[in-house]
């Protein structure tokens, strides 16, 4: 089967690699550098499994800048373009998705379009009405950055949307796509759910909001424990051994961040509109309170320093260990709060060559020099290369994992 994938981020590329084991896949992107890397067997993103599969597996995959040619020949078109949250309108920016839909429909009269981008509840219905076609369906992704292909190989569940009154072809394509994902997976007995588009859209947003809820819950627990000088580690262990709660997703942090949780929680809150709720709004608020609290704690530690020059060293901007993503990283908001107090910031981030021009922080990518300059080293996730300056480190990373 010929499949086109719009977007070579961690969602699009992981799906492209997965499906190219048994199908002919063309990845479409607007960046020549990404296209060149993929065509040379290199991954443009950090993902151990994607890197290995591109290098070592027999894949039928290519990348192109020629979107129309790719879409024209495809039987299925997977759309995995960004949908960033627009704080001005309090809604996802879906213009890239809509642009691809319009382009595909203009050159291809038979392909079914499968949206993998995270979208607002009701978006598929809106697009079907706008473009007067039922050939647009949704399949939510449940992937972790840097582990996207692994999560496609070992999925927790597969969800594809389909409506009762859809044409036989669209129904067949929805089932076919679910089967493609299931047959490519290494995990046995993966649950497959076919449901309405709005229900599938809701699953994605509510699932991520629940994960944000867990992060916020354990962060508030940690705030209480630190404020009362209690052992946060022991409290969390004591709670988490309850099977109903579980010893997972319970490690305190500076706040949830990354590409998905911040925008998905805000979008779900926007979708509620006039529907009664308090919890969803509280999750978003809790995350902001946590970041403010962390900044305050750092300032308090600085005040105890005898040095006349106060320098905060930020160790890594990445949100998670082994990630290459800084988007919506909680530490960036903490930095902004500290800078508003005229505190000098130096940053160690080896994945950056320079900071944005308006950033008043200083990039120090010589680790030993960074350690010497900083009065206090702040890190969301602890790394063993800080072991020799452990007495300088402020982190709420209790379990040494994400």
UniProtKB/Swiss-Prot annotation:
Q: Name one GO biological process term.
A: polysaccharide biosynthetic process
Q: Which gene encodes it?
A: hasB
Species source reads Streptococcus pyogenes
Keyword NAD appears in the UniProt entry: yes
Mention one GO molecular function: UDP-glucose 6-dehydrogenase activity
Q: What is this protein called?
A: UDP-glucose 6-dehydrogenase
**Effect listed in the UniProt record for changing residue 145 to Q:** Increases Km for substrate 6-fold. Increases Km for NAD 3-fold. Reduces catalytic activity about 10-fold
Per the record, the pathway is: Nucleotide-sugar biosynthesis; UDP-alpha-D-glucuronate biosynthesis; UDP-alpha-D-glucuronate from UDP-alpha-D-glucose: step 1/1
Taxonomic superkingdom: Bacteria
- For this UniProt record, give its keywords in alphabetical order, as a comma-separated list: Capsule biogenesis/degradation, NAD, Oxidoreductase
EC numbers on record:
1.1.1.22
Physiological role: Catalyzes the formation of UDP-glucuronic acid which is required for capsular hyaluronic acid synthesis.
User: Which residues of the sequence carry a binding annotation for substrate?
Assistant: 142-145, 204, 249-253, 257, 319-320, 402
Question: Which reaction equation describes what this protein catalyses?
Answer: UDP-alpha-D-glucose + 2 NAD(+) + H2O = UDP-alpha-D-glucuronate + 2 NADH + 3 H(+)
Which residues does the record give as NAD(+) binding sites? 2-19, 29, 34, 83, 118, 145, 263, 327
Q: Which family does it belong to?
A: Belongs to the UDP-glucose/GDP-mannose dehydrogenase family.
Can you tell me which residues form the catalytic site? 260
Instruction: Please provide an example of a Pfam family that matches this protein in its UniProt record.
Output: UDPG_MGDP_dh
């Amino acid at each position: 089967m010929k499949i086109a994938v719009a977007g070579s981020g961690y969602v699009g590329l992981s799906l492209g690699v997965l499906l190219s084991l048994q199908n002919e896949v063309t990845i479409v992107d607007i960046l020549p550098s990404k296209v060149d890397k993929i065509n040379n067997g290199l991954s443009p993103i950090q993902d151990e499994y994607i890197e290995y599969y591109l290098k070592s597996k027999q894949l039928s995959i290519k990348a192109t800048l020629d979107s129309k040619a790719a879409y024209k020949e495809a039987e299925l078109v997977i759309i995995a373009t960004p949908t960033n949250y627009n704080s001005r309108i309090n809604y996802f920016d879906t213009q890239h998705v809509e642009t691809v839909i319009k382009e595909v429909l203009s050159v291809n009269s038979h392909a079914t379009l499968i949206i993998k981008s995270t979208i607002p509840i009701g978006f598929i219905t809106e697009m079907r009405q706008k473009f007067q076609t039922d050939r647009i369906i949704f399949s939510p992704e449940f992937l972790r950055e840097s582990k996207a292909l692994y999560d496609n190989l070992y999925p927790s569940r597969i969800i594809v949307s389909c409506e009762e009154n859809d044409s036989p072809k669209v129904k067949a394509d929805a089932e076919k796509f679910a089967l493609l994902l299931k047959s490519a997976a290494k995990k046995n007995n993966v649950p497959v759910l076919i449901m309405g588009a709005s229900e599938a859209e809701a699953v994605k947003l509510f699932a991520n909001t629940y994960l944000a809820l867990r992060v916020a819950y354990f962060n508030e627990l940690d705030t209480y424990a630190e404020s009362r000088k209690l052992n946060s580690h022991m409290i969390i262990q004591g709670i988490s051994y309850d099977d109903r709660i579980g010893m997972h997703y319970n490690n305190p942090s500076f706040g949830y961040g990354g590409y998905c949780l911040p925008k998905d929680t805000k979008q779900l809150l926007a979708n509620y509109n006039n529907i009664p709720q308090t919890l969803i709004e509280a999750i978003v608020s809790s995350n902001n309170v946590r970041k403010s609290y962390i900044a305050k704690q750092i300032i308090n530690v600085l005040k105890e320093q005898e040095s006349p020059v106060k320098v905060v060293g930020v160790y890594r901007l990445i949100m998670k260990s082994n990630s290459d993503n800084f988007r919506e990283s909680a530490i960036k908001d903490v930095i902004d709060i500290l800078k508003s107090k005229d505190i000098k910031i130096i940053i160690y981030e080896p994945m950056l060559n320079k900071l944005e021009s308006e950033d008043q922080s200083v990039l120090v990518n010589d680790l030993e020099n960074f350690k010497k300059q900083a009065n206090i080293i702040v890190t969301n996730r602890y790394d063993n290369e800080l072991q020799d300056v452990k007495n300088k480190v402020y982190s709420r990373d209790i379990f040494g994992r994400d």
